[in-house]
Amino acid sequence: MDEIWFAGIDLGGTTIKLAFINQYGEIQHKWEVPTDKTGDTITVTIAKTIDSKLDELQKPKHIIKYIGMGAPGPVDMAAGVVYETVNLGWKNYALKNHLETETGIPAVIENDANIAALGEMWKGAGDGAKDVILVTLGTGVGGGIIANGEIVHGINGAGGEIGHICSIPEGGAPCNCGKTGCIETIASATGIVRIAKEKIANAKKTTRLKATEQLSARDVFEAAGENDEIALEVVDYVAKHLGLVLGNLASSLNPSKIVLGGGVSRAGELLRSKVEKTFRKCAFPRAAQAADISIAALGNDAGVIGGAWIAKNEWLKHQNC
């Protein structure tokens, strides 16, 4: 039997991650290319790099049955249209049509956090569970909600925008979405750095963070791991707000798995345990009892694996027609 591969693509602000993945969710080859931040040549770049990689591997193009791609922002999955991606200047952008035209391969488009959630459900910390919440903590905060094995899209593609749940109703920091006080302004890497700088400026206690040039969220968690008081205050504050948001979500959705992903989640147990403490306090007891909170297992591969999952499902639908 001929090999069957799917192309999983995760469009990020800095890089486009790509992988050829078989029908069992096993990565055969993976690589990345820089993102054109104007958004103008992204599909051309993807088409060229897929062709180039297939040539390098001496594989025929027909081995790739379908492409599954994740893009930032709300997506009309049926039409394959990205409603808006601010960083790339896209508005009502027909990504599916452009991608299929350039590659000659059928494609399906989904929100980037949603494909990460599907990847973790299929092959990662979701462990095959059908009711999963993934929150991605990176430069921003994204989210994917899976209910009964299906991504929650909502009426116009805005389902799962966990990063824009209001955490501070009055006096919160401004968010890229135009509101203030979103959890993204607190639990993202940029939010953590902002909070740390505010605490350092007002601190009477000594802290190693004062001497850190180009302060990062990683610096904050490393200092907290060494019991730096200011760093611990920052982590406690972040975990408290994130635990509250996740507790409210769990009370509404009753998931079996809550997965923390993205670069900030590399803080590991230090972050997870503190988030869980507030979560258990805030969630409806029966919902809290049912939910396991864990760190994402797939790292940067979650998106491409989730992309392959939706690609495989679309391909199977057409096989059964």
UniProtKB/Swiss-Prot annotation:
PROSITE patterns in the record: ROK
Induction: Constitutively expressed, activity is maximal at the end of vegetative growth and declines during stationary phase when grown in rich broth (LB) (at protein level). Expressed in a similar fashion in minimal medium containing glucose, fructose, trehalose, maltose or sucrose.
One function term, GO molecular function aspect: glucokinase activity
Activity's thermal dependence: Optimum temperature is 32 degrees Celsius. Enzyme is stable up to 40 degrees Celsius.
Pfam families: ROK
Cellular component terms (Gene Ontology): cytoplasm
Reactions catalysed: D-glucose + ATP = D-glucose 6-phosphate + ADP + H(+)
UniProt EC number: 2.7.1.2
GO terms under biological process: glycolytic process
Protein's cellular compartments: Cytoplasm
Annotated ATP binding sites: G8, I9, D10, L11, G12, G13, T14
Gene disruption phenotype: Loss of glucokinase activity, no growth phenotype on glucose, fructose, maltose, sucrose or trehalose-containing minimal media.
Entry keyword annotation includes Transferase: yes
Keyword Kinase attached: yes
Alphabetical keyword list: ATP-binding, Cytoplasm, Glycolysis, Kinase, Nucleotide-binding, Transferase
Family under the similarity heading: Belongs to the ROK (NagC/XylR) family.
Cited function: An ATP-dependent kinase that phosphorylates glucose to make glucose-6-phosphate, not active on fructose, galactose or mannose. Restores glucose kinase activity in E.coli glk mutants.
Name of the protein in question: Glucokinase
The gene coding this protein: glcK
